Swiss-Prot record:
The gene is dgk-5. It comes from Caenorhabditis elegans. The keyword Nucleotide-binding applies. GO terms for molecular function: ATP binding; ATP-dependent diacylglycerol kinase activity. Residues 414-551 form the DAGKc domain. This is Putative diacylglycerol kinase K06A1.6. GO terms for biological process: diacylglycerol metabolic process; intracellular signal transduction; phosphatidic acid biosynthetic process; phospholipase C-activating G protein-coupled receptor signaling pathway.
Amino acid sequence: MIFPIGIPMISKKRKSAQEAVSLREAAERRSQFARVPARSVSAPPRKKWFRSKQQLSGAADGMDGSSRAGSQEIVCDEFTKKLVAAITTWHDIHSSLLQLSIERSSNDSNEEHENVSVSSESSWSSASDSESDEDSATGRDSTNNHLSASAARFSISNPDLTNCQIKQMFPEMADHWRKALAKSPVVRRTAADQETSNPVNKHRSSRYWIEDEGDYHILPSEHVWLPSSTGSSASADSECYVGEKDCRRSGEKRRCAACHIVAHTNCFSLLAKLNLNCKTTFRDYATKKTPSKESTDGLTAHHWVHKWRHEGRCNTCAKSFQQKMFFQGKEKKETIAVTCSWCKESYHLKNCFARDKLEERCNRGALKEMIVPPTWILRLANRKRSSRTPSHPRKHKKSHRQFVVKPTDLWSSGPSQPLLVFVNPKSGGNKGSKALHTLCWLLNPRQVFDITSLKGPKFGLEMFRKVVTQLRILVCGGDGTVGWVLSTLDNLNWPAYPPMAIMPLGTGNDLARCMGWGGVFSDEPISQLMQAILHETIVTHLDRWRIDVEPNTSCNLEEEDDGMQSALPLTVMTNYFSIGADAHVALQFHHSRSANPQMLNSRLKNRIAYGGLGTIDLFKRSWKDLCEYITLECDGVDVTPRIKELKLHCILFHNITYYAGGTIPWGESSDNKPSCCDGKVEVLGFTTATLAALQMGGKGERIAQCSRVRVITNKAIPMQVDGEPCLLAPSIITLGFHSKVPMLKREKKTPCTPNLMRRGTRYGQKDSQVQSTSLIIQLPVIVVGRADYDNYKDCFERLKDTAYEIGIVNVESEAELDSARVLIQRLLVEHNSLPYEPDKNWRFLDYVSNAEEGTFRVSRQQEHVQSVSDVCNTDECLLILDHAFPSITDREAVELFQPQQPIPSTSTSAAPRYHNSRRISETLRIVLSSDAQETHL
């Protein structure tokens, strides 16, 4: 049998009798079997070669193991002995083979094999000169290490190697042996080890930004790989991007957050070989002074991505993309669309995509005014460390900035409002992580930062320091995340703060409510939020207040609490500062969550726990004697007598309108209406009863509106600043004005969704009355409930499975939604066996225009400007949301649904009704998909 590594004959030099077990003798035994040609290698050894009839009968009679082994030695012929010894030899050396790398190509495999043989021969010869058993073992280990180092360019785990190169390495090994080798558990384990050793950017950690001293190197066109979930949206591709012919079909499927391609982990190397890179996000320092035309075109051109499945409309013919169902072995998989990952332009690949688009300059689409182009983001050259020992080590601790954002002339029409995004993935359950991935698709991934992996916003703020005059900031998180960014800006000493918008993903979101962004971000596409930042915002200001704490030395504590602190957790207040019962409940909740973080890991659980603790405190009235331990002065006026008169349990210093998750404690009266930028803070008082009544529309007791507050405490009292509670020792607290920061306040103007902008120019016509040529189609109408919508709005296929079909309407594809509402409402009223009582305030659901993000409700105010084809696929169904419709869980508990009776359909005109088909006929479909520019029926 011939083996992969040519084991040479060992030198004829004889050694003493004491060196009986040496590497030389082992090599001689191996070479003896290697010189004997294999007579029947192509056939696997059968069991009858090892056992005779005598053995079988002996085994049946209870023959012991020693006698069976002796009979085997008698029966085995000479070839069998050699074959067994050869297999044993292979197991001795296979560990060295498995450590070799995958970079060696099949063309130079013979040359590399000779080099490996020569190096192994010299290694074995040198090892044979050892003088003891211990030295022999050491020589064998060094030989294996030498093999790994000198020929570290092979890997049995590589599929190409197991199929092609193993055949060249082992020409006399039969196919079944090579297949068995490829399926061995050792090979599978080695492949898994190699996969884990390569860094995969699963959640955009700090490795995406900071290069370590290892082998990892950040590339300008690096993919941002994420776990691919099947059916995540109506337009999510599930086919491997390398193609059906080259796909290895092994490994976990991952999806790039920046360009939305899908590939197996074992196909990543093929993507690099085929030059299927992601969109370029930055440029290197080497191309700064004299950039070539090729590098400039690569930074400013489109980044086209092929799609097997796509929603929306073609930018050339304005027709939707017909989805194809792929059946294994029956239809060839073809790409139906091509889209740019920058500007999001989409075209039919066969008829509508022009070749000159490949060299066209990309304008970055509807969000071009906030997308930071890759020509602006510069990666600086690495600084080499000096060999000299620094005389002052402290001066050399300053970290080196690896990236910097600087406007250049390469992009003449740069963004007027570049956006810097900070996302807290832990906020809002899974919403923060999903927002991070969606923003990487809509914007440049290099302008979106995970605030937790980088341990704060400092890295991103320093990177964008040179564009501070144009910069806008978007904070995706709660009020605490906003305060984190503002405090970091204070530490950086910026001369001016950029205006800040908020995506509310926290629990309370009172600051987001005050700025017009709402209390919960759940029913709006992120692309629409980006449009709102551009067109629906004004710059306002937010007051911030400084809190100084000094110990009250005149007060002697009788007993000290272990949790008592001498300073507040925050020194700058943005939302509110409270003393007493409110802070006591917050402190209890903080301790409960710290002790059991797994029990309080969602917004709903937090609200339930907070409400339960508040209810307990309502009856206990823990701080009913608060007025006995504090002295309060507002603008130099002592208001302590009023606190004692009202017997307050809580004192609140309020800066914004909302408090405790959307309540308005000051009231909505026009007199002395509070403002977040008037330079004054509102002082209110509560009892435990009025605190509980806030959630039902109650108000607090107004004490004062002032610009300076002084509080003296004579006892350790719980306090909280912007939701951060603590038990503060007796202190003298002074609250004064700190600064004003600009904020982006959202004001509802005109709708600015991409649908509305597209409809005006779809066919190049504006408000001109042209005879409609749209077809009357039979469109099924299905209804879903609110609970199912909240659970499955990110997965359209799963949401559709929970729906119930209420009937069919005959409607024009370009009919407006308000006219379709009349037809559907009539269908609900005339339904004979509807299993629930419908609500008149049902809503349309849009699963087409923002399919990359999920399904969203359509506002009633937008129904007169959106058509049926804008919110649904006319080949599938029209989806509506009814709050009265029971969820799928309730339907499983109660059998509501009976066999549906025939339902009369309604139409928008006197056209004949179609009873033989539920959808548009195949003939009309062919006409619509033809190459004709216009079709008249």
